[in-house]
Amino acid sequence: MKRPFIISLILLLLFFSVSAQRVGLVLSGGGAKGAAHLGVIKALEENGIPIDYVAGTSMGAIIGSFYAMGYSPDEMLELILSDEFGYWQTGVVENDYKYYFKRPDDTPDFMRFSIELSDSLRIKTNVLPRSLINPIQMNQAFMGLYAQATAKAIWNFDNLFIPFRCISADVYNKKTIVWRNGDLGDAVRSSMTFPFFFKPIWKDGVPLFDGGIYNNFPVDVVKEDFHPDFIFGSAVAGSEVKPSENPMHQIQRMVMQHTDYNVAEEDGMIVKFNFPDVTLLEFFKAKELMDIGYERTLSMIDSIKQRVAREVPLSELNARRRAYKESLPSLKFRNIYVTGVTESQRIYIEDQLHRDINGEFSMEEFKYAYFKMLSDAKIKEIVPKAVYNRKNKNFDLYLDVKITDEINVNIGGNISSHQANQLYLGLGYQGLGEYLTDLNANFQMGNAYSGVSFSGRIYMRTPIPSYLNLELAYSYQKYSESQSLFYEDLLPAFIKQREKFMKLKLGLPFMTHAKAEIGLGYGRLSDNYFQTTNISFLDSKFDKSWYDLFRMSLRIERNSLNVKQYPTEGRQQFFVAQYVTGKENTRLYNQPIQSKIDLNWLQIKGRWINYSKVNNHFRLGVMGETVISSKNLMNNYTASILQAPAFTPTPHSKIVFNEAFRANQYIAGGVIPVFLINNMFHVRGEFYGFMPVEEIKKEIISLSPYMDRPYYGNHFRSFEYMGEAAIVFQLPFVSVSLFANGYSYPKKNFNVGLNIGFLIFNSRFLD
C-alpha cells in the first residue's frame, strides 16, 4: 500500500509542478527588425508553448503590447503592413482626413518661422523641428489603439490579456523607467520614442525616451516582476555592427548604451537575429523578417519542449483571445474636457465634435474632427486621452490643446537661369475665439511678376461650415522681347499687365473632399502693349487698354496632389463658372480719341489632373482642360489675345507670352510620364496638345500698319503642342528642377533652364 501511495504522490506533485510552470517572453528593441518577433510568437503558439508574461523595449514594446491586448501574430503583421501604420511612423495625414475646406492656397514659400506676440516678441524658427516625424498621427492613433485595453485593465498592466511590462529612459536623471501601470498607449509610445525622430512623452515633469537607451532587453524586469519558471528571449539587436557612414546608424550607436542580450542557461533560452541590411523604419520587410523568426524558432522547439512541459492548445488560446476582445468596452465618447484654452476657444473646439442622437461620437468621427481642428494654424497640437467612465459605460475625452499666438512669416520664391527670379514674403495671423479668423498678406517681387495681396477670412458658426473671405490685390506682370538662358534685364518689356481688384467669397464644403466658393468681385485690368514687334521699343509709346469689370462666380475645386509643383501622385479637379460685365477702354498712342465698348460674357473653365500608379517606379499623369466662353473680341488683335484665357500647364509657360496658346474657347490635354528614382528624385516628361475652338486671327489694316483687326477663324482648324522634360529633386522644403522644353510656335522655340524654388503667382481677377 505504501509504494502505490508514494508513486501517486509523486505523480500528483509532478502534475501541479507542470501545470504551474510559467513562461515569460522578452522582446528586444530594434526598429523594423523587430518584425522577427512575430515569427517567434507564431512558432511558440502553434507548438503549444505558453506565453504567460511579456516584456519589451521599443519595437519589442509595440509587439509585446499588441500581444498583451489579444492580437494574434497574423493580426499584428497585417497592422504593421497597413497604410495606417505607415502614416503613424511618417506623420503624413492620409487624403481622406485632410480638411480641404480650410486648406490655404499654394504659395511659393520654402522657409517658415513665427514671431510670438508676447512682451519679448520671441522669434521661433521652424527650420529645425522638435522631432523629425510629426506627432499629429501618433497622438490620435495610440489613443484609439490602446484606450479599450487600458480601460479593461483598470490601468494595471497585470490585468491585460497577457501581463505586460515595457521600458522607457529618463535621460535627465539617467535611469530606467519600468511601466507597470498607467495609460498603455503612453507607456508604449515612450518606450519607442527614439531621440530626434519622435516627440517624447512627459511623465512627472520629465520627458521619456526610447527604453533601449539604457535597457534594450529587459530580462531583469521579467525576473523581478513575474518570477517565471522559464524565460524565452528574442533579440534582433546587439550584433556586432561595422562602422558606417550612414548618419542613422551613427546616431543609434551614440544614443544606445550597452545591453546584455543574453538569457542565463538556468533561466531559459534565447534566439538571436542579425539583420545588418534592415534599417530602423523598413517595415515593408516585415513579412520576410517574420518568416525568418518563425523558421529559426521552429528549429528550437524540441529544445524548448525539453524545458517547458506544459502545453496550451492553439484552439484554447484563440478562444480565450476572442472572449477577451469581446469583453472590451466599446470605444464611444460622450463627455469632453478641454484644457489649455479660453472659454470661447473651448466652445469652438467642442462645436467641431458632432454627437449622434445619444449624445455620443465614435473614434472615427473624432478622427475626422481631430484633423479638421489641426488644419487651423492657431491650434499647434492636440493631445487626446480617453478615460473610461464606468458609470456611463463610455469614454470621457480629454483634449490638451496647445494654442499659439504668433505671426507666421513665410519666405520663398524662385532662383532661375531665365526670366523667373522671384522673391516671396508671406505674413499670416490666425485668431481663435468663438469664431476662427485668418488674416494674410503676401508680397512677390521679381523681374517677371510682382504683386501684393491682403485677405481676411472669418469662419462662421453655421449648421453647414462656411466662411466669408475678402481679398484685395494688385499685380504687375511683364513679358519681354527675350526669354533666353541667363537672361539679363536689359531689353524693355513689350507687354505690361496690371490688375487691381477686390473679391468677396462665400466658401462652403462640397461633398467630402472639395469646396465651393460663390464670389463677387470688381477689378481694373490694364494692358500696355505694342501691336507689332517691327519697331524700336526704346523710342515707341505703348498702346493701352483697360477694363473696368464686375464678376459673379461659382468655383468648385478639390486638390490631393502630393506637392505644389511637379507632383507625382494625387488628383486635382476644378470647375469655374463666371459672369463678367463691364467696359473696355482703349487709347492708341497715335490717336487722341479714346474708345469705349460694353462687355458682357459668360465663361466656364474646367481642369482635371490625375496621377496613377503603374508600379513602384512609374506614375502616369493625365491632364485635361477646357474653356467655354461667350466672350467677344476686343478692340484690336493684341488686346484680344492678351485678355484671352491662356493654357499654361508648366512653370516655364507661365512666364512666357505665347499667343498660339491663348483663345477664348479651347480644348487641351496631355500625358505626364513620371519615373521615380527614389522618394526625392524623379525624371518626368510633359506632353500637351492645345486646340482653339475658334482661333483668334488678325487682319492687317492698310491705313494703320500698327493696328490689326481681330476675327475668329474656322472651328478646330488650329493645333499646337508643347513638351518638357525635367529632372526634379523634390526636397522636403524646396523643389530643384533642370528642364528642357519646346513649343510648336514660334518655330525652333527651345529652352533649357534651372529652377530652385517655386513659380507660383497670386490668383488673378478672372481665375
Task: Describe every region a protein language model picked out.
Residues 408, 549-678, 682-695, 700-710:
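C-terminal outer-membrane beta-barrel translocator/porin domains of Gram-negative envelope proteins
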Residues 20-57, 65-382, 386-388, 401-405:
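Patatin-like phospholipase
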Residues 218-219, 251-264, 670, 710-714, ...:
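Short glycine-rich, acidic/polar surface loops and turns
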Residues 1-23, 767:
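Bacterial Sec-dependent N-terminal signal peptides
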